Amino acid sequence: MGDEPLLQKVKIQEDIESVPLLQKVKIQEDIESVKGIRVNNDGEEDGPVTLILLFTTFTALCGTFSYGTAAGFTSPAQTGIMAGLNLSLAEFSFFGAVLTIGGLVGAAMSGKLADVFGRRGALGVSNSFCMAGWLMIAFSQATWSLDIGRLFLGVAAGVASYVVPVYIVEIAPKKVRGTFSAINSLVMCASVAVTYLLGSVISWQKLALISTVPCVFEFVGLFFIPESPRWLSRNGRVKESEVSLQRLRGNNTDITKEAAEIKKYMDNLQEFKEDGFFDLFNPRYSRVVTVGIGLLVLQQLGGLSGYTFYLSSIFKKSGFPNNVGVMMASVVQSVTSVLGIVIVDKYGRRSLLTVATIMMCLGSLITGLSFLFQSYGLLEHYTPISTFMGVLVFLTSITIGIGGIPWVMISEMTPINIKGSAGTLCNLTSWSSNWFVSYTFNFLFQWSSSGVFFIYTMISGVGILFVMKMVPETRGRSLEEIQAAITR
């Protein structure tokens, strides 16, 4: 009896080379159980962070940086563009808003692009629109070319806002997947801050030209980075998938278990056809769609675009110095984004989302109360600082959770056979909500400077309950485990 585990181990070792790849995973687990070693399901022995993984992530994040420069461009460029091209306020407002129209176009085709051409191919399409957009803006001599350039930037942003987080989630080891994905939010905040800083000291034409630099980096990088192993496997290119995974994990890393897990999951999906848009409403995918759409609606209708697009108007109304407020807000966002990167894989997505949604609600409540007291002539001396504090609390909620984690979780939860359709639906929802909030904010702010923030407070309050009730925890689990559990 005492020799039985040893004999079992010998038999397992003899059989290893004679079985297919999928069975090796089970055999390895048997060996570990014989040795008394716990099978790793938490990513503790997950693949290492390699140079090619870092370079691939950097290349993808250039797309996010370009999106951030587009979002931040209008604030420092407004005076120069209106004077240089003799634009009216209405014409410049249209120039700013056309980004969201382009975003809707990009969002509508993002999922299909990523499915047909791969994640890397979709990034190439996004990069082409981005480069063309910035060059058109930089050399614009008329309103029409300015608007078309801005429209192209929106298309690029609409594609990149979906493809970048999906690509990063699919290539990163699960132990650092949340950290790598959270860098997306940091890059977004940093790019807006950098654009504002540069725009305050150089002309808008030079700012547009400099904004092509991330596009150039991305263009070069796309020639050297691997395609997503999961996309390759889904399309029947198993050998290429294993080669891609080996490059990402390093030549000295045993990818047998991870490759087998991916292949097994993809094989199981073969019994399902490539589901179309209307198949998303199948009860099988109800929770995926509900959580994904719910988080994005919460993100936008909770006031994200209202704060970010009209931050200057908020500070001006409260009496807080605009330049100081915007600069300090950019610094705080960058610092708290770093904090989000550090803690996202330590405390989990759901926990951070709960805290972030509470902060989102609190930030809007403080801002709303500040303007309410101001309207009644109460505590007016404290209105500027209390408004500033409310804005900072809200923006911190964006950087530590509500800004980036919804996209991370959508990428983690969505099975690859509906990723294109679900990505398109989620992206369209996000950009439509973005447009709605950015369009209505000025009207609501004029109607009641406090009322608009109380509306955001109520929406965020509902969001707290939604996160606590509906959102699953995905930290430390493989994509295949997450997707199998949520689509039962």
Swiss-Prot record:
Which Gene3D superfamilies does its entry note? MFS general substrate transporter like domains (1.20.1250.20)
**SUPFAM superfamilies in UniProt:** MFS general substrate transporter (SSF103473)
Q: Which Pfam families match?
A: Sugar_tr
Matching InterPro entries: MFS_dom, MFS_ERD6/Tret1-like, MFS_sugar_transport-like, MFS_trans_sf, MFS_Trehalose_Transporter, Sugar/inositol_transpt, Sugar_transporter_CS
Chain's role: Sugar transporter.
Q: What is this protein called?
A: Putative sugar transporter ERD6-like 13
Q: GO MF terms on file? A: sugar transmembrane transporter activity
Provide this UniProt record's keywords sorted from A to Z.
Membrane, Sugar transport, Transmembrane, Transmembrane helix, Transport
**TM segment ranges:** 51-71, 89-109, 116-138, 151-171, 182-202, 207-227, 291-311, 324-344, 353-373, 390-410, 423-445, 451-471
* Organism in which the protein naturally occurs: Arabidopsis thaliana
* Family, per entry: Belongs to the major facilitator superfamily. Sugar transporter (TC 2.A.1.1) family.
- Where can this protein be found? Membrane
Under the cellular component aspect of Gene Ontology, which terms does the record hold?
membrane
> Membrane topology type, per the record?
Multi-pass membrane protein
